[in-house]
Regions:
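PLP-dependent aminotransferase-like
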Residues: 106-163
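Short acidic capping loops at alpha-helix termini that bridge into adjacent secondary structure
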Residues: 36, 86-90, 110-113, 157, ...
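Phosphate-binding glycine-rich loop
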Residues: 64-113
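PLP-dependent aminotransferase class I/II
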Residues: 50, 71, 220-304
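PLP-dependent enzyme catalytic core of the Aspartate aminotransferase-like
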Residues: 1, 325-329, 333-334, 338-370
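N-terminal "arm"/small-domain region of PLP-dependent enzymes with the aminotransferase-like
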Residues: 2-66
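Active-site pre-lysine segment of PLP-dependent enzymes
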Residues: 147-157, 169-192, 196-228
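Conserved PLP-binding catalytic core of the aspartate aminotransferase-like
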Residues: 286, 295-329, 345
């Protein structure tokens, strides 16, 4: 029966290796017989959601029997004020992942090509395959995007380029100058999507100001952002894109009419107003990164300086073994084997106590391997 069912699906769908999210914490606690687990694997906000967002959700609950506002009018209006971008240049998605999917569906046909880095967000190749297109993976340069390499990989079949900036899972970034030189050379019929999911954690002074290109209506530039990371709303699934009015108009044509639920819209709009919460989050991540760097140097481990809320490190041991060893002690991190980094793990910056516990457990494991 399974073999017969397989034949119903297109061949390029059959070949897809699905994205594998981590197991729920409660399930792992039962399986591992642990009383509590610290999760530093998915780059979530350790402070939780904004209190203003929670209050907004409570006020909105009595109206959940009504369909949500299809255009996300209130949230788009708040973002327009925040970013200084007209409302017709913004679209809200069920997480920024949905907008990545809209771009793939809108631009890709079988045989088309998508270019990105060899070590970047795993959703890019999956959605490329869903559309029957070819994913072109350009080797990294210093654990980041090689923009010159991407330019050299462009062919007449190239339709989309994805650039995660800062990059996930490495935390590296491309600079303002690099981006300007890159954009000037990309053919106008190729859409370049800058995925800025982690932009709120950036401290580099030469990080590119991509919203400037949106304000000047560059027709082939799209910028993605999310409320899942710094704003602490990962469970509600809210993201957005900024692009030219024409681009946004076409994306609206193919999105689901009620794609973002009413509680998510309300919470996101309220979260934008909670500047103190955002400041606390940034401070926590900044200090947490420095703490981890110092401890990793003490252990003699290589790490990649990060502009995001996570740190990528080389343990010198099999990444899956390190993952399992930490999991048995109640700590979830992310093995990077799926990215071809066989001895590397990625760790979300948590609260100070969580970061300290991670360091203690990693140190204990490494000593046991000597």
């Amino acid at each position: 029966m399974l073999t017969a069912m397989r034949e119903f699906f297109k061949k390029h769908i059959q070949a897809i290796r699905p994205y594998e999210p981590g197991k729920p914490i409660k399930e792992l606690e039962r399986e591992m017989e642990l009383r509590s687990i610290i999760k530093l694997a998915s780059n979530e906000n350790p402070l939780g959601p904004s209190r203003k967002a929670l209050r907004a959700i409570r006020r909105a609950i009595p109206e959940i029997h009504l369909y949500p506002e299809s255009s996300c009018y209130e949230l788009v209006g708040r973002l327009s004020e925040e970013l200084g971008i007209p409302q017709n240049q913004l679209i809200i998605g069920n997480g920024s992942n949905e907008i990545i999917e809209l771009l793939a569906r809108g631009f890709l046909s079988e045989g088309d090509e998508v270019i990105s880095s060899e070590c970047s967000f795993l959703v890019y190749p999956i959605l490329t395959q869903v559309c029957g297109a070819k994913y072109v993976s350009v080797p990294m340069k210093n654990y980041g995007y090689d923009l010159k390499g991407i330019l050299n990989a462009i062919t007449d079949r190239t339709r989309l380029i994805f650039i995660a900036n800062p990059n996930n899972p490495t935390g590296t970034y491309v600079t303002q100058q690099e981006v300007e030189e890159f954009i000037a050379k990309v053919p106008k019929n190729v859409v370049v999507c800058f995925d800025e999911a982690y932009v709120d954690f950036v401290e580099a002074t030469d990080f590119p100001h991509m919203m400037f290109h949106i304000k000047t209506e560059k027709p082939n530039i799209v910028v993605l952002r999310t409320f899942s990371k710094a704003y602490g709303l990962a469970g509600l699934r809210v993201g957005y894109a900024a692009a030219s009015p024409e681009m946004i108009g076409y994306l609206h044509k193919i999105r689901q009419p009620f794609n973002v639920n009413s509680l998510a819209q309300t919470a996101a709009a309220a979260a934008l107003d909670d500047r103190f919460f955002l400041w606390r989050t940034k401070l926590l991540v900044s200090s947490g990164r420095k703490y981890l760097y110092k401890r990793l140097r003490r252990l003699g481990l290589t790490y990649i300086p990060s502009q995001a809320n996570f740190v990528l490190m080389d343990t010198g041991r099999d990444a899956q073994e390190v993952f399992q060893a930490l999991l048995r002690q109640g700590m979830i991190v992310r093995s990077m084997k799926a990215y071809g980094l066989s001895t590397w793990i990625r760790v979300t910056v948590g609260r100070r106590s969580q970061n300290a516990q991670f360091y203690r457990l990693l140190r204990k494991y490494l000593k046991s391997q000597q």
